[in-house]
Amino acid sequence: GTLPCGESCVWIPCISAAVGCSCKSKVCYKN
């Protein structure tokens, strides 16, 4: 929840979810 993964999730899910990122406020974050 604190480290941006450099990916947005406005239209599609986080591809970086594979490495533990999740969508928050239209941006993918890790932890």
Swiss-Prot record:
Post-translational modification: This is a cyclic peptide.
Crosslinked positions (Cyclopeptide (Gly-Asn)): G1-N31
InterPro entries the UniProt entry points to: Cyclotide, Cyclotide_bracelet_CS, Cyclotide_sf
Keywords from the UniProt entry: Disulfide bond, Knottin, Plant defense
Disulfide-bonded cysteines: C5-C21, C9-C23, C14-C28
Source superkingdom: Eukaryota
Any single GO BP term: defense response
Xref: Pfam families: Cyclotide
Domain notes: The presence of a 'disulfide through disulfide knot' structurally defines this protein as a knottin.
Stated role: Probably participates in a plant defense mechanism.
Sequence similarity: Belongs to the cyclotide family. Bracelet subfamily.
Protein name: Cycloviolacin-O6
Organism the protein comes from: Viola odorata (Sweet violet)
Lineage: Eukaryota, Viridiplantae, Streptophyta, Embryophyta, Tracheophyta
